[in-house]
Structures are given as structure tokens and as C-alpha cells.
Amino acid sequence: MAKLSVSDSPERRTGFGRANARERSINQRKLRVLLAEKMHLIAADLAFELEQEGLEVTAISHTLAETMQLIAHKPIDLALMNVEFSDGKSYPAARRLKDAGIPFAFFTTFTQDEIAEDFRTAPCLRKPQDTHRIAAAVKDLARRARRDPEIP
């Protein structure tokens, strides 16, 4: 699975102390979730469910371009992304997340085999899916992020 961390702190820019600073930060607050979903109604429903599970949806995007901007400028701890947007597939965003060290999962109609080879080990939640089950899976990813900020 790919990882993402977005921060302007010196620890994040240099890599020094990144795990310890991130672990302290994550354990002291709600996890900030980026939700990247092209369908507005699905995104709103899923955001509601994630917040009911105690996560903070700090950003919602509906295109690849918006997703890339949010990754670059918004602090997030994990992401849930559709694979396909109107302006392209989410793989450039997945690459940024992976390189930055923040966990993510795909939420898509794609099968694991249809996902680009570089990202086949990332968690893949298949659509259609009950939003309660999706929220529970993201909460599990969040628990893993809290325990180990360097999870693959």
C-alpha cells in the first residue's frame, strides 16, 4: 500500500524525526482523511459515514487535478480514492501519496488486477459497497496508521 504525508514542517521536509513527529501528531487528534471520489453524492454519503466513525474528512475532491492540489497543500493522514476521474486515473496522486508516506486505499469498481501494477498491493475497496463497511475499512486503516506511521 502506498503512503502519504503532507506537511511543511522541517521534520517532514528533511525526513529527520518524521516517524516520531507524525506518530505524536496522529495519536493526539482525529485522523485527517482526503476523500477523492468523482461522484458528489457518493462522496457526501461516505464523508458522513467516515465522520460518524470518528475520522475527520478534511478534504473532498472530485477530479484528479483537485486531488493533486489537495495532496500538495492540505495536511492529511490517509486517503480514500477512486481510481478513475473525468480528467484521468488517480495513479499520479497514488504515487505522491506513496512517496510522501501516507496510507491510502482505492474505492473503485476496478478489480485488483485492473489496477496499475505499481499499486496492486494497496487496499482496494470495491464499489458498490455499503458505506458502513467502507467506513469500517478506512477506520481499520486509520488504526494501522496510528500504530505505525511507516506502514506500507
Indicate residue ranges for each PLM-predicted region:
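Conserved acidic segment of CheY-like receiver
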Residues: K30-L41, L46
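Conserved phosphotransfer microenvironments
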Residues: M81-K98
